[in-house]
Amino acid sequence: IVDAKGNAAAFTGEECFDWAGHIVGQHYACQGNILVSEDTVQAMAHTFEKTSGALVGRLLAALQAGQEAGGDRRGQQSAAILVVREGGGILGFNDRYVDLRVDDHPTPIEQLASLLKLHELYLGETDPDNLVQIQGEVAAEIQEILVRTGYYQGPSTGVYDEATKKALRDFVSIENLEGRWRDDDLLDSVILGFMRERF
């Protein structure tokens, strides 16, 4: 259990199957049973403490470290991450900021990482330090991608004109990236990366 102030407590009963145990620290508790060894929870705790950034990323890094250190001695099957934040759900309708799970897969933590990447793409917020100006080579590249995807019929001029803007806005809306849309001449680099990778 970890309370709202980051104080943690855990209990491992004597009837758990080896290896079983836990480590608690400020803002976290790592525990398990039927693990390969104590190395699993030690790796999780160490990684959580040393990783910076958002909680969801730290949790995923800890899960990955635990698996790399041996994990469950029966193998892999499922993984999940739940992070709650007041009003943090889609459009603020609930508090489930991140609620992802893989119930049955040979590499569930890898699958969970893929789901988190998609979650951040579609529901993440634009970083104001991660914007690209749409002009010159960037504008031309966007126009070429929009031609390939059928959103734009004009020439690749490198000018961010109204026709290009409308085509880009349509693309962003159809791809469900409208939460990252800006109405000026700046583009979230996540959108540009998505366009380059997929199209």
Regions found by a protein language model. Give the residues of each.
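N-terminal nucleophile
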Residues: 1-131, 136
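Short acidic, glycine/serine/threonine-rich helix-capping segments at coil-helix boundaries
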Residues: 130-199
